[in-house]
Amino acid sequence: VRLLPILLNQLSFKTNPSAHMHLNQNATLSFKFEIFNQSIKQLIHEKLPIYLDAISNFPLQVLDNVFNKSTGFSLKVGNDFIEITNPFEVVGFDETESLLPIDQHTHQAYRLLMEYFCFPEKFNYLNLNLNFLKHLPIEKNEFEVLIHLKLNLNDQACIQNYAELNVANFKLFSTPVVNLFNKQAE
């Protein structure tokens, strides 16, 4: 894991039934970050690993909404909003990220299924591609990534789960597995 000079300061969720109605987006999940040591240029080509640590299957629901076609993204710098493409990438599905040994006869889908049942938390990871920082003025060290979601506002359990999210649910600089000893997984 590569440590970067960036910190997730605040996370907030709010429903806004009419703000993005023309885009069918009625809720916003906001991530407020702080950059240290004026290191924007260093961070532009980096990917920030994020682990979604929440109750039961809710991380999967968050991931599903992040990668939904109707979801929009913007960067907030001060009072300015800049629309950006989805800066998030899924982690754990690529063959190079496999944890279980595979042979040439094992189908990729079977490997993913086995890994999901052995290591379900492995699929609660995201990478935040920091390439959008090119829009950030050099003198700024704080910004927000806004995720504009389309949620069923009548689903009170879902809204409550989003409202209870906080910074502790999004762990930076973590990795799914550290293999300290060479041992065959069975």
Regions found by a protein language model. Give the residues of each.
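Intrinsically disordered, low-complexity, polar/charged repeat-rich segments
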Residues: 1-186
